[in-house]
Amino acid sequence: LNSPNAVLQHMSIPQFLGKGTPVVFVRKSESDYGDVVRVMTGVYIKFFFKTSKLCVDETVWKVNDEELVVTGGNVGNENDIFKIKKTDLVIRGMKNVYKLLHCRSHLGCKNIGGNFKNGYPRLAAVDDDKDFIPFVFIKA
């Protein structure tokens, strides 16, 4: 049985805010204590499912060879690390707007932007520093 592994983007329409799938941030370093994830700290991102259904064993995000964000990563793999960076954007009065970076070991970081693949809005690692999808975090 093959499970779908695409990480898709909820469109930024007000009625959809907060209806995406919750994620958990797993800190890369055990020396980063507490419940707070600090900006520009290496983290692994994994979907948080409250279910026992099939296809939830691959929940950790990674970037594949096509530069698309997919599941199937591993906590502990240096190539599956993301970072959160604060931006100066203000969206709908919200000042705490962030962008995600994918940081492969020894290759630097790329913004997480978007593209359409097979008709779906996909998250993807992009080279252009000005091309990124802004994120607002909502506690699940």
From Swiss-Prot:
InterPro entries assigned: Kunitz_inhibitor_STI-like_sf (IPR011065), Prot_inh_Kunz-lg (IPR002160)
Alphabetical keyword list: Disulfide bond, Protease inhibitor, Thiol protease inhibitor, Vacuole
Disulphide-bonded residues: C103-C109
Classification lineage: Eukaryota, Viridiplantae, Streptophyta, Embryophyta, Tracheophyta
Name of the protein: Cysteine protease inhibitor 6
Entry's family note: Belongs to the protease inhibitor I3 (leguminous Kunitz-type inhibitor) family.
UniProt-annotated location(s): Vacuole
Function: Inhibitor of cysteine proteases. May protect the plant by inhibiting proteases of invading organisms.
Pfam families assigned to the protein according to its UniProt record, in alphabetical order: Kunitz_legume
GO MF terms held by the record: cysteine-type endopeptidase inhibitor activity
One Gene Ontology term, aspect cellular component: vacuole
Gene3D superfamilies: 2.80.10.50
